[in-house]
Amino acid sequence: METRGTSRRELLSYSMSDSNTTDFTNPSTFILLGIPGLEAAHVWISIPFCTMFAIAVLGNFTILFIVKTEPSLHEPMYYFLCMLAVTNLILCTSTLPKMLAIFWFNSKEINFNACLTQMYFTHCFSVMESGICVAMAFDRYVAICDPLRHSTILTNPMVAKMGLAVVLRSSIFILPFPFLVRHWPYCTTNIIPQPYCLHIAVAKLACADTHVSTFYGLFVTFCVTGLDGIFIAVSYTQILRAIFSLPTKDARLKTFETCVSHLCVILAFYIPRLFISLMYRFAQNVPLPFHVLIANVYLLVPPMLNPIIYGVRTKKIRVRLLR
Protein backbone atom coordinates (compact mmCIF):
# COMPACT_ATOMS: atom_id res chain seq x y z
CA MET A 1 0.00 0.00 0.00
CA GLU A 2 2.80 2.39 0.77
CA THR A 3 4.40 4.21 -2.19
CA ARG A 4 8.00 3.81 -0.97
CA GLY A 5 9.32 3.78 -4.51
CA THR A 6 8.00 7.26 -5.23
CA SER A 7 11.04 9.49 -5.49
CA ARG A 8 11.19 12.87 -3.80
CA ARG A 9 11.95 14.40 -7.20
CA GLU A 10 8.67 13.12 -8.64
CA LEU A 11 6.74 14.25 -5.59
CA LEU A 12 8.17 17.76 -5.76
CA SER A 13 7.64 18.01 -9.51
CA TYR A 14 3.92 17.49 -9.00
CA SER A 15 3.93 19.71 -5.93
CA MET A 16 5.61 22.67 -7.59
CA SER A 17 2.99 22.67 -10.32
CA ASP A 18 0.29 23.39 -7.74
CA SER A 19 -0.33 26.90 -6.49
CA ASN A 20 -0.77 25.69 -2.91
CA THR A 21 2.96 25.03 -2.47
CA THR A 22 4.25 27.15 0.40
CA ASP A 23 6.65 27.27 3.30
CA PHE A 24 5.21 26.31 6.65
CA THR A 25 5.97 24.41 9.83
CA ASN A 26 2.57 23.38 11.17
CA PRO A 27 0.14 22.72 8.31
CA SER A 28 -3.58 22.90 9.00
CA THR A 29 -4.44 21.03 5.81
CA PHE A 30 -2.91 18.74 3.20
CA ILE A 31 -3.70 18.72 -0.51
CA LEU A 32 -4.50 15.30 -2.02
CA LEU A 33 -3.80 15.23 -5.75
CA GLY A 34 -5.77 12.09 -6.56
CA ILE A 35 -4.00 10.22 -9.38
CA PRO A 36 -1.15 12.59 -10.41
CA GLY A 37 -0.89 13.00 -14.16
CA LEU A 38 -4.35 11.52 -14.77
CA GLU A 39 -6.46 14.40 -13.45
CA ALA A 40 -8.32 14.71 -16.76
CA ALA A 41 -9.42 11.08 -16.45
CA HIS A 42 -10.52 11.25 -12.80
CA VAL A 43 -14.23 11.03 -13.64
CA TRP A 44 -13.68 7.95 -15.80
CA ILE A 45 -11.38 6.35 -13.24
CA SER A 46 -14.06 6.88 -10.60
CA ILE A 47 -16.53 4.60 -12.43
CA PRO A 48 -14.75 1.26 -11.78
CA PHE A 49 -13.69 2.47 -8.32
CA CYS A 50 -17.27 3.38 -7.41
CA THR A 51 -18.51 0.05 -8.80
CA MET A 52 -16.00 -1.93 -6.73
CA PHE A 53 -16.89 0.13 -3.66
CA ALA A 54 -20.62 -0.56 -4.13
CA ILE A 55 -19.98 -4.30 -4.58
CA ALA A 56 -17.75 -4.36 -1.48
CA VAL A 57 -20.30 -2.57 0.71
CA LEU A 58 -23.27 -4.62 -0.53
CA GLY A 59 -21.38 -7.93 -0.36
CA ASN A 60 -19.96 -7.46 3.13
CA PHE A 61 -23.25 -6.22 4.58
CA THR A 62 -24.92 -9.27 3.00
CA ILE A 63 -22.42 -11.58 4.70
CA LEU A 64 -23.07 -9.91 8.07
CA PHE A 65 -26.85 -10.16 7.62
CA ILE A 66 -26.79 -13.82 6.58
CA VAL A 67 -24.53 -14.93 9.44
CA LYS A 68 -26.59 -12.97 11.99
CA THR A 69 -29.95 -14.35 10.85
CA GLU A 70 -28.91 -17.97 10.19
CA PRO A 71 -28.33 -19.95 13.45
CA SER A 72 -26.50 -22.76 11.62
CA LEU A 73 -23.76 -20.26 10.73
CA HIS A 74 -23.00 -19.36 14.34
CA GLU A 75 -19.64 -21.13 14.23
CA PRO A 76 -16.02 -19.92 14.66
CA MET A 77 -15.27 -19.76 10.93
CA TYR A 78 -18.28 -17.52 10.27
CA TYR A 79 -17.54 -15.33 13.29
CA PHE A 80 -14.09 -14.69 11.82
CA LEU A 81 -15.74 -14.08 8.44
CA CYS A 82 -17.91 -11.39 10.07
CA MET A 83 -14.79 -9.79 11.54
CA LEU A 84 -13.27 -9.79 8.06
CA ALA A 85 -16.43 -8.20 6.62
CA VAL A 86 -16.43 -5.41 9.23
CA THR A 87 -12.71 -4.81 8.62
CA ASN A 88 -13.26 -4.60 4.87
CA LEU A 89 -16.16 -2.17 5.29
CA ILE A 90 -14.16 0.18 7.52
CA LEU A 91 -11.07 -0.08 5.31
CA CYS A 92 -12.83 0.93 2.10
CA THR A 93 -15.16 3.53 3.66
CA SER A 94 -12.22 5.29 5.32
CA THR A 95 -10.71 6.14 1.93
CA LEU A 96 -13.26 5.86 -0.90
CA PRO A 97 -15.63 8.74 0.03
CA LYS A 98 -12.76 11.25 0.05
CA MET A 99 -11.28 9.70 -3.09
CA LEU A 100 -14.58 10.08 -4.94
CA ALA A 101 -14.90 13.67 -3.68
CA ILE A 102 -11.54 14.39 -5.31
CA PHE A 103 -12.54 12.65 -8.56
CA TRP A 104 -16.00 14.22 -8.82
CA PHE A 105 -15.81 17.61 -7.08
CA ASN A 106 -12.06 18.37 -7.09
CA SER A 107 -12.27 18.54 -3.28
CA LYS A 108 -8.56 18.07 -2.61
CA GLU A 109 -8.12 19.64 0.82
CA ILE A 110 -8.07 17.45 3.92
CA ASN A 111 -7.69 18.66 7.49
CA PHE A 112 -4.40 17.70 9.17
CA ASN A 113 -6.13 15.72 11.93
CA ALA A 114 -8.48 14.09 9.41
CA CYS A 115 -5.43 13.04 7.39
CA LEU A 116 -3.85 11.44 10.47
CA THR A 117 -7.12 9.67 11.29
CA GLN A 118 -7.44 8.34 7.74
CA MET A 119 -3.81 7.20 7.83
CA TYR A 120 -4.35 5.36 11.11
CA PHE A 121 -7.53 3.61 9.96
CA THR A 122 -6.03 2.57 6.61
CA HIS A 123 -2.91 0.99 8.11
CA CYS A 124 -4.62 -0.35 11.24
CA PHE A 125 -7.36 -2.23 9.41
CA SER A 126 -4.95 -3.51 6.78
CA VAL A 127 -2.88 -5.11 9.57
CA MET A 128 -6.11 -6.28 11.21
CA GLU A 129 -7.14 -8.09 8.02
CA SER A 130 -3.83 -9.94 8.06
CA GLY A 131 -4.45 -10.99 11.67
CA ILE A 132 -7.94 -12.24 10.83
CA CYS A 133 -6.47 -14.38 8.04
CA VAL A 134 -4.19 -15.95 10.68
CA ALA A 135 -7.14 -16.63 12.99
CA MET A 136 -9.04 -18.26 10.12
CA ALA A 137 -5.99 -20.38 9.27
CA PHE A 138 -5.87 -21.57 12.88
CA ASP A 139 -9.57 -22.46 12.69
CA ARG A 140 -8.97 -24.55 9.55
CA TYR A 141 -5.91 -26.17 11.14
CA VAL A 142 -7.86 -27.31 14.21
CA ALA A 143 -10.89 -28.37 12.13
CA ILE A 144 -8.79 -30.63 9.87
CA CYS A 145 -5.85 -31.73 12.02
CA ASP A 146 -7.73 -32.16 15.32
CA PRO A 147 -11.44 -32.27 14.39
CA LEU A 148 -12.61 -34.04 17.57
CA ARG A 149 -11.36 -31.15 19.71
CA HIS A 150 -12.46 -28.31 17.42
CA SER A 151 -15.57 -27.46 19.44
CA THR A 152 -13.67 -27.60 22.74
CA ILE A 153 -10.68 -25.54 21.54
CA LEU A 154 -12.51 -22.87 19.53
CA THR A 155 -15.25 -22.04 22.00
CA ASN A 156 -17.09 -18.72 21.80
CA PRO A 157 -14.95 -17.18 24.59
CA MET A 158 -11.77 -18.32 22.78
CA VAL A 159 -13.00 -16.84 19.49
CA ALA A 160 -13.75 -13.56 21.30
CA LYS A 161 -10.25 -13.53 22.85
CA MET A 162 -8.65 -14.18 19.46
CA GLY A 163 -10.68 -11.38 17.90
CA LEU A 164 -9.73 -9.00 20.71
CA ALA A 165 -6.05 -9.93 20.32
CA VAL A 166 -6.21 -9.16 16.58
CA VAL A 167 -7.81 -5.75 17.23
CA LEU A 168 -5.41 -4.80 20.04
CA ARG A 169 -2.32 -5.90 18.10
CA SER A 170 -3.13 -3.82 15.04
CA SER A 171 -4.26 -0.82 17.11
CA ILE A 172 -1.08 -0.79 19.21
CA PHE A 173 1.40 -1.42 16.39
CA ILE A 174 -0.03 1.32 14.14
CA LEU A 175 -0.54 3.90 16.92
CA PRO A 176 3.03 5.35 16.62
CA PHE A 177 2.44 6.35 12.97
CA PRO A 178 0.18 9.39 13.60
CA PHE A 179 2.19 10.42 16.68
CA LEU A 180 5.42 10.48 14.67
CA VAL A 181 3.80 12.40 11.82
CA ARG A 182 2.24 14.97 14.17
CA HIS A 183 5.59 16.00 15.67
CA TRP A 184 7.53 16.52 12.43
CA PRO A 185 8.17 19.99 10.95
CA TYR A 186 6.97 20.55 7.37
CA CYS A 187 8.62 23.25 5.29
CA THR A 188 8.53 22.28 1.60
CA THR A 189 4.98 21.45 0.57
CA ASN A 190 1.69 20.15 1.92
CA ILE A 191 0.81 18.31 -1.29
CA ILE A 192 0.42 14.52 -1.24
CA PRO A 193 0.48 12.78 -4.66
CA GLN A 194 -2.20 10.32 -3.52
CA PRO A 195 -6.01 10.31 -3.19
CA TYR A 196 -5.72 9.45 0.53
CA CYS A 197 -3.20 9.80 3.37
CA LEU A 198 -0.55 7.12 3.87
CA HIS A 199 2.24 7.14 6.41
CA ILE A 200 5.12 7.00 3.93
CA ALA A 201 3.53 9.66 1.67
CA VAL A 202 3.23 12.14 4.56
CA ALA A 203 6.70 11.22 5.84
CA LYS A 204 8.22 12.32 2.53
CA LEU A 205 6.96 15.86 3.16
CA ALA A 206 8.73 16.27 6.51
CA CYS A 207 11.83 18.46 6.89
CA ALA A 208 13.31 16.20 9.55
CA ASP A 209 15.12 12.91 9.90
CA THR A 210 12.40 10.30 9.35
CA HIS A 211 14.64 7.23 9.61
CA VAL A 212 12.96 6.14 12.85
CA SER A 213 9.59 6.22 11.15
CA THR A 214 10.91 4.38 8.08
CA PHE A 215 12.53 1.65 10.15
CA TYR A 216 9.43 1.28 12.29
CA GLY A 217 7.30 0.94 9.15
CA LEU A 218 9.60 -1.85 7.92
CA PHE A 219 9.44 -3.47 11.36
CA VAL A 220 5.64 -3.53 11.23
CA THR A 221 5.70 -4.90 7.69
CA PHE A 222 8.13 -7.74 8.35
CA CYS A 223 7.46 -8.55 12.01
CA VAL A 224 3.67 -8.35 11.87
CA THR A 225 2.41 -9.22 8.39
CA GLY A 226 5.60 -11.23 7.70
CA LEU A 227 5.10 -13.40 10.77
CA ASP A 228 1.43 -13.74 9.86
CA GLY A 229 2.44 -15.12 6.48
CA ILE A 230 4.83 -17.59 8.10
CA PHE A 231 2.17 -18.77 10.55
CA ILE A 232 -0.34 -19.26 7.73
CA ALA A 233 2.24 -21.18 5.67
CA VAL A 234 3.06 -23.48 8.61
CA SER A 235 -0.65 -24.03 9.30
CA TYR A 236 -1.38 -25.01 5.71
CA THR A 237 1.68 -27.25 5.56
CA GLN A 238 0.19 -29.23 8.45
CA ILE A 239 -3.27 -29.09 6.87
CA LEU A 240 -2.00 -30.46 3.55
CA ARG A 241 -0.12 -33.24 5.33
CA ALA A 242 -3.33 -34.21 7.12
CA ILE A 243 -5.33 -34.08 3.88
CA PHE A 244 -2.87 -36.26 1.93
CA SER A 245 -2.90 -38.81 4.74
CA LEU A 246 -6.62 -39.47 4.21
CA PRO A 247 -7.35 -42.88 2.68
CA THR A 248 -9.54 -41.98 -0.31
CA LYS A 249 -9.47 -39.37 -3.06
CA ASP A 250 -13.04 -38.30 -2.33
CA ALA A 251 -12.21 -37.71 1.33
CA ARG A 252 -9.16 -35.65 0.36
CA LEU A 253 -11.15 -33.50 -2.09
CA LYS A 254 -14.04 -32.99 0.33
CA THR A 255 -11.69 -31.92 3.11
CA PHE A 256 -9.65 -29.65 0.86
CA GLU A 257 -12.82 -27.90 -0.33
CA THR A 258 -13.39 -26.64 3.22
CA CYS A 259 -10.15 -24.63 2.86
CA VAL A 260 -10.59 -23.28 -0.66
CA SER A 261 -12.48 -20.11 0.32
CA HIS A 262 -9.92 -19.18 2.95
CA LEU A 263 -7.02 -19.88 0.58
CA CYS A 264 -8.60 -17.61 -2.04
CA VAL A 265 -8.98 -14.82 0.54
CA ILE A 266 -5.32 -15.20 1.55
CA LEU A 267 -4.17 -15.10 -2.08
CA ALA A 268 -6.34 -12.03 -2.79
CA PHE A 269 -4.77 -10.26 0.20
CA TYR A 270 -1.09 -11.27 0.11
CA ILE A 271 -0.24 -11.68 -3.60
CA PRO A 272 -1.20 -8.11 -4.65
CA ARG A 273 0.47 -6.80 -1.49
CA LEU A 274 3.69 -8.63 -2.38
CA PHE A 275 3.52 -7.50 -6.01
CA ILE A 276 3.03 -3.84 -5.05
CA SER A 277 5.79 -3.98 -2.43
CA LEU A 278 8.26 -5.42 -4.97
CA MET A 279 7.15 -2.96 -7.65
CA TYR A 280 7.72 0.05 -5.39
CA ARG A 281 11.18 -1.13 -4.40
CA PHE A 282 12.57 -2.43 -7.69
CA ALA A 283 10.48 -0.99 -10.57
CA GLN A 284 11.89 2.52 -10.30
CA ASN A 285 11.13 3.34 -13.94
CA VAL A 286 7.39 2.73 -13.56
CA PRO A 287 5.53 6.08 -13.81
CA LEU A 288 4.13 7.57 -10.61
CA PRO A 289 0.48 7.53 -11.83
CA PHE A 290 0.71 3.76 -12.36
CA HIS A 291 2.14 3.26 -8.85
CA VAL A 292 -0.69 5.25 -7.28
CA LEU A 293 -3.41 3.67 -9.42
CA ILE A 294 -2.31 0.11 -8.60
CA ALA A 295 -2.11 0.92 -4.88
CA ASN A 296 -5.68 2.21 -4.97
CA VAL A 297 -6.96 -0.84 -6.84
CA TYR A 298 -5.30 -3.07 -4.23
CA LEU A 299 -7.14 -1.24 -1.46
CA LEU A 300 -10.49 -2.18 -3.03
CA VAL A 301 -9.90 -5.64 -4.50
CA PRO A 302 -9.85 -7.72 -1.27
CA PRO A 303 -12.98 -6.05 0.25
CA MET A 304 -14.80 -6.63 -3.04
CA LEU A 305 -13.64 -10.22 -3.60
CA ASN A 306 -13.94 -11.62 -0.07
CA PRO A 307 -17.77 -11.74 0.12
CA ILE A 308 -17.95 -13.02 -3.46
CA ILE A 309 -15.49 -15.82 -2.68
CA TYR A 310 -17.34 -16.94 0.44
CA GLY A 311 -20.74 -16.46 -1.19
CA VAL A 312 -19.83 -18.69 -4.13
CA ARG A 313 -17.67 -21.27 -2.35
CA THR A 314 -19.56 -21.74 0.95
CA LYS A 315 -22.67 -23.87 0.52
CA LYS A 316 -24.45 -22.68 3.69
CA ILE A 317 -24.10 -19.02 2.69
CA ARG A 318 -25.04 -19.74 -0.92
CA VAL A 319 -28.19 -21.65 0.08
CA ARG A 320 -29.26 -18.96 2.55
CA LEU A 321 -28.66 -16.24 -0.05
CA LEU A 322 -30.80 -18.02 -2.66
CA ARG A 323 -33.80 -18.47 -0.37
Enumerate the predicted regions with their spans.
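Transmembrane helical core of 7TM receptor-like proteins
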Residues: 1-323
